[in-house]
Amino acid sequence: MRRRRYLRDRAEAAAAAAAGGGEGLQRSRDWLYESYYCMSQQHPLIVFLLLIVMGACLALLAVFFALGLEVEDHVAFLITVPTALAIFFAIFILVCIESVFKKLLRVFSLVIWICLVAMGYLFMCFGGTVSAWDQVSFFLFIIFVVYTMLPFNMRDAIIASILTSSSHTIVLSVYLSATPGAKEHLFWQILANVIIFICGNLAGAYHKHLMELALQQTYRDTCNCIKSRIKLEFEKRQQERLLLSLLPAHIAMEMKAEIIQRLQGPKAGQMENTNNFHNLYVKRHTNVSILYADIVGFTRLASDCSPGELVHMLNELFGKFDQIAKENECMRIKILGDCYYCVSGLPISLPNHAKNCVKMGLDMCEAIKKVRDATGVDINMRVGVHSGNVLCGVIGLQKWQYDVWSHDVTLANHMEAGGVPGRVHISSVTLEHLNGAYKVEEGDGEIRDPYLKQHLVKTYFVINPKGERRSPQHLFRPRHTLDGAKMRASVRMTRYLESWGAAKPFAHLHHRDSMTTENGKISTTDVPMGQHNFQNRTLRTKSQKKRFEEELNERMIQAIDGINAQKQWLKSEDIQRISLLFYNKNIEKEYRATALPAFKYYVTCACLIFLCIFIVQILVLPKTSILGFSFGAAFLSLIFILFVCFAGQLLQCSKKASTSLMWLLKSSGIIANRPWPRISLTIVTTAIILTMAVFNMFFLSNSEETTLPTANTSNANVSVPDNQASILHARNLFFLPYFIYSCILGLISCSVFLRVNYELKMLIMMVALVGYNTILLHTHAHVLDAYSQVLFQRPGIWKDLKTMGSVSLSIFFITLLVLGRQSEYYCRLDFLWKNKFKKEREEIETMENLNRVLLENVLPAHVAEHFLARSLKNEELYHQSYDCVCVMFASIPDFKEFYTESDVNKEGLECLRLLNEIIADFDDLLSKPKFSGVEKIKTIGSTYMAATGLSAIPSQEHAQEPERQYMHIGTMVEFAYALVGKLDAINKHSFNDFKLRVGINHGPVIAGVIGAQKPQYDIWGNTVNVASRMDSTGVLDKIQVTEETSLILQTLGYTCTCRGIINVKGKGDLKTYFVNTEMSRSLSQSNLAS
């Protein structure tokens, strides 16, 4: 908790800095990376280093007492090692307190480095004669861990390492130059030391650089994965909001599952639907009440409105009705022009459903009355309510709209049509459910509606309880109404309705709520949506950027909070704690097969270490033919391996590469992309370097070995200090320690293969350690013992070559093992993050596609783009005026007779299944390229409404040639023909004889989106009304059009037959035409289309 509090405090400071702009954001990201680096690398590595150093101190003490050395002769050693152990243990305790570690990071690094350097000088100065090779391995260890394990940055690590190596070189050079004795090899030894230190610096810097690059990549992948999760959560939230804004929850999730299955395709693994029918998302509900309401006088008012005023008025009115519906536990079903209908008792049955609908109707009448009183506009509300059973759900494949069907729904519609403006007209069934809650009076609906008379429906008017109290608005008309009498009625309406403040359609797409929800989860409503052409955009405001940064910081803090020094040793859901293998075998196989383009650089670094070993041995070893031949053969082998690895790049750079050398290009590609060639080359490369580190040790001349006193010689002979001959011979074998240093460099060469299998490197180093210890402690032990005993009277542990070599190799082996494991763990972690990121991106794409399908299922694509791409400041309602749109109504009148409710057809469900098939087949036509310009608007019962000409930019309509300007009208006629063909095919399979009746008209329309809850795209205007009348007054199996439309069709090559003058409700007498179904057209249209 302390660490989390600390991280959160830092996050708040970073967020405050982020508010300052781009520089602040960069500081915030830098701080997050530093925290991530600190907890994932610096903290665990410094802990491991302290453990290694403390373990080494304990091992030295154990070896000291195991060898039975005299305490009096090694007082300095016994003081130095326990003191260092105590200091390192104290630092270890403090480092384990993470808050202290974070604050004193640099101090701990400096103290550890100083302690190690001090230990090296103490070992050098106390314990016997100082030699040119003294403590080179220990100082090499310091140099290497300064880069790889101490939490220094690269600059500080270079400075500390240079100080370490140069101080050792300078001290030894000055001290030995002033000491009497043989100095003929001093220069070469010091130069060899310098080469060893340079190699240690290069290997350490290389290791640090690659590890930092790998960690930066892991950090980026972590951030990307977290961002993708944020985005995925957002997409899921977004699609749920979209889906629930279109459909009720009880049916939305079922449809969502099918869409996802369809988007994912066969790979998702679900069984394909073997049913010949489309899925039907319709359910039966009993005991519900249906309300139909129509705004009387709105058609006349709308004729004087501008597009913006019309859409604004409808949105405000229906937004108010939605609010009233919510208050009265009603669900709005659909908006049909200026008609509004809803149901109470869905999806959960409600005992007060009739009371809810009646109260809803009274509230609607009251709302309209307030509008009429406030504006003086003559509009009113006619409401009809009936109670019964319904089938509710969604039919078709596109432009889903939740709807209800049943005889009771039809009756409710006629209750509205047979009602009176300003009154709520109810049936006797609804009256029974009211249980006396309202006073009623005779409705006499059968007088005004023949359907009610035919079905002997007894109707009533509900008496409004508020009717006896006249509102103040009725008594005193507002001043602005009287003053504004000269204003157009639409202007007065618009100004008044603005005070209602109805929510805008799809406002939730850009809803700016808090980043954290009540359950503690982080909200993601401000993350940009998607990667599609209309979704690929940046965060739009500074506040959004700030919130997104805060959320990302919070998630990163959670990730960092879960990282500690012991995490990789504890149980993980993905990675085994000992072997570091993935539990998932497929992921393990995929990780092993990962391409490794950097492998050639690993080989290059290993070859540079080999070069350093060669230079060191050339400087100090006797120049023999075996030395030359052995290193020459090794050089040729490594150069060949290096050439094969770089062959691809070399041949790509060369313009005149021979085709015979293409196998080299393929070979380098195989090495980079396949694991087994890499493993083979790793084994060969490291085997050559490790072997050459000690190879020439087996070819020491006999004279160099026999002139030395052996272990069998009496102690008296070997311990005489004035044995000048023995000392002279011993000094001639000054190169022996450099074999040990070469072995250490050989082990380091194994560690440079960072991304190669950890277990392979461990096995190679283990084999090398066993082999080296066998040489040092067995095969060549007598040479090393004799050398040490001749050079030193009572050699200490760090002066005795055999002990020093074995301990040094073991310490380096453990250090490299820890580094290798750490590297492997984070490489695997990085791969895991990438793998999760990839999967989450695929899931995000599915969610984005789902959102797109959902939104384009209710809106045309260009309208969906408007809502997704708009700026937050653009809160205007969407509306668009078009001069030439072709509108079609295609109905199946016979379906009303076909629809029956009985036990045989599951109370009408099977009838709706057939209607679903018909509408779905009609919708299938929309996916054909030639009908891409056809926009389905809605279905009304068994009537299919569509339009063309809505996709064109209105400003471009007049710029087109007349023929092209009206081509979409021809497309609509073609679509009507296709509908007839589809219906004929269904008739053959279902043994029915349904006929299509089509009405088409063209002209100006207003398009817009209204309704915050269940937003709906619709078109309005006289063109739409006339098209509807062309259908309702039409003839089965005929396409009826107006005279103006017939003239356009004839110019496009269609033939039309005059029907004559017919009376159209609300329009008077109109001359109409039938489009000939023989489709006798000239070739002119096909030429235009081409």
Curated annotation (Swiss-Prot):
Expressed in brain, olfactory epithelium and lung. Mg(2+) 2 binds at residues 294-295, 338. One of its GO terms (molecular function) is ATP binding. GO terms for biological process: adenylate cyclase-activating G protein-coupled receptor signaling pathway; adenylate cyclase-modulating G protein-coupled receptor signaling pathway; cAMP biosynthetic process; cellular response to forskolin; intracellular signal transduction. The chain crosses the membrane at residues 45-65, 75-95, 107-127, 132-152, 157-177, 186-206, 601-621, 626-646, 679-699, 734-754, 763-783, 800-820. It catalyses: ATP = 3',5'-cyclic AMP + diphosphate. Residues 1-44, 207-600, 821-1090 are cytoplasmic. Interacts with RAF1. Interacts with GNAS. Interacts with the G protein beta and gamma subunit complex. The protein contains two modules with six transmembrane helices each; both are required for catalytic activity. Isolated N-terminal or C-terminal guanylate cyclase domains have no catalytic activity, but when they are brought together, enzyme activity is restored. The active site is at the interface of the two domains. Both contribute substrate-binding residues, but the catalytic metal ions are bound exclusively via the N-terminal guanylate cyclase domain. Belongs to the adenylyl cyclase class-4/guanylyl cyclase family. This is Adenylate cyclase type 2. It comes from Rattus norvegicus (Rat). The gene is Adcy2.
